[in-house]
């Protein structure tokens, strides 16, 4: 018995490490799974039979059948998981498609509109009758007239507001027709036109300017006393009045 154990240990040492590890793991898994069954297996003997060091027996056959069943169940479970994942993906895709369906329809419509050639649109425009074109032209004219009326009304209101603001100054202020006349005449009669412009501009102020007064105190008083108080100088008095006073 001791010699058999020593030989088993020597065989285990001589075996490749990866094969030994695979066989040991498989046999240990089988032993753990079947230990509560009617025929438990020895993992050491199972691993030797797995590595072809010992002739195969019932233990290795049992473990191999269990391993094949285990692989089938694992693959079946994986297949079910894959099917469930595929179903979930399909459901998610269908839900997204339902949500994006109106957006996709609008995009298709826009693509169709852009893909239609310009000649078709020209044909559609030519399908309108002359009556419709005349109606459109009449409507445009009415809009233009209404816009012009609004501008005229607006200008009149502005003028009224300005007249109220400046107290009639704009009505009294003359137009500068003299500048236009100068441009037309080429600069001729410039003094006369300028005098008329000044005369209209100052509103009769130039008419109140009087000529020089010829009396004695004109240089001294500048005509102020004569205009305001009607003062009569001695040079204008009658000298006979003084002689009569002296005679009396």
UniProtKB/Swiss-Prot annotation:
GO terms for molecular function: neuropeptide hormone activity; opioid peptide activity. One of its GO terms (biological process) is neuropeptide signaling pathway. PROSITE patterns: OPIOIDS_PRECURSOR. Residues 175-195 are annotated as: Disordered. It is found in: Secreted. The keyword Disulfide bond applies. Pfam families: Opiods_neuropep. Keywords: Cleavage on pair of basic residues, Disulfide bond, Endorphin, Neuropeptide, Neurotransmitter, Opioid peptide, Secreted, Signal. Residues 1-21 form the signal peptide. Its main location: secreted. One of its GO terms (cellular component) is synapse. Residues 176-185 have a biased composition (Basic and acidic residues). Residues 22-163, 177-199 form a propeptide. The N-terminal domain contains 6 conserved cysteines thought to be involved in disulfide bonding and/or processing. Leu-enkephalins compete with and mimic the effects of opiate drugs. They play a role in a number of physiologic functions, including pain perception and responses to stress. Belongs to the opioid neuropeptide precursor family. This is Proenkephalin-B. The lineage of its organism: Eukaryota, Metazoa, Chordata, Craniata, Vertebrata.
